[in-house]
Amino acid sequence: MYLDQIKAELVEAQDLLNKFISDENNIKLIQEAALLISNSFKQGGKVLSCGNGGSHCDAMHFAEELTGRYRENRPGYPAIAISDASHLSCVSNDFGYEYVFSRYVEAVGQKGDVLFGLSTSGNSKNILNAIEAAKTKGMKVIAMTGKDGGKMAGLADVEIRIPHFRYADRIQEIHIKVIHILMMLIEFEMAKQA
């Protein structure tokens, strides 16, 4: 009944992953992001992650694997997904949803920390504001985007961009793969210090 559609979905996902892998710069950017985060941890810094919708779930997933575990039993790493419901509702109500992440960065972020922002369009105003707040605080910024990078193109210290222009879910599929690779590399790098 749906076998052709199922296969087409899997082939499209495979094609996008192959396209992403074929650009050697993407591989280098993933390594750069992992080292940036690891170096922050080694210097006493932390990661603040944020996103909207499915990207919000990915931001939480990343923070959970940093504080909890990925593949290895090891100490937890300092990470916070900006997801506290009372903070989000307070700032949305009092200031506007475009400030929900930047207010948190202003309150909690410190020089040497890393902001990890996800936006499939690269145009999320609340992530753009968080990037601006992070830079003001002396934080490093990693942006995971899609399409042409949107307004976030060129703003981050490291931008990992998925060049897909159709559906956000395809971009998110690569984002979660990259997050898992980052976790693996961070665990490798932090184990050197242990």
Curated annotation (Swiss-Prot):
Q: Where does the protein end up?
A: Cytoplasm
**Example GO biological process:** D-glycero-D-manno-heptose 7-phosphate biosynthetic process
* UniProt-listed PROSITE patterns: SIS
From the record, give the transmembrane residue ranges: none
- Which residues does the record give as Zn(2+) binding sites? 61, 65, 172, 180
Q: What does the entry's cofactor note say about binding and number?
A: Binds 1 zinc ion per subunit.
Q: Which cofactor does it need?
A: Zn(2+)
The pathway is: Carbohydrate biosynthesis; D-glycero-D-manno-heptose 7-phosphate biosynthesis; D-glycero-alpha-D-manno-heptose 7-phosphate and D-glycero-beta-D-manno-heptose 7-phosphate from sedoheptulose 7-phosphate: step 1/1
Highest lineage ranks of the organism?
A: Bacteria, Pseudomonadati, Pseudomonadota, Gammaproteobacteria, Pasteurellales
Q: How does it assemble?
A: Homotetramer.
Q: Which residues bind substrate?
A: 52-54, 65, 93-94, 119-121, 124, 172
UniProt protein name: Phosphoheptose isomerase
Supply one GO CC term from the record.
cytoplasm
EC number(s) on file: 5.3.1.28
Name the gene. gmhA
**Is Ribonucleoprotein a UniProt keyword of this protein?**
no
| Family, similarity comment | Belongs to the SIS family. GmhA subfamily.
Role this protein plays: Catalyzes the isomerization of sedoheptulose 7-phosphate in D-glycero-D-manno-heptose 7-phosphate.
Q: Which UniProt keywords are listed?
A: Carbohydrate metabolism, Cytoplasm, Isomerase, Metal-binding, Zinc
**Residue ranges of domain SIS in the record:** 37-194
User: What does the record's miscellaneous section state?
Assistant: The reaction produces a racemic mixture of D-glycero-alpha-D-manno-heptose 7-phosphate and D-glycero-beta-D-manno-heptose 7-phosphate.
GO molecular-function annotation terms?
A: carbohydrate derivative binding; D-sedoheptulose 7-phosphate isomerase activity; zinc ion binding
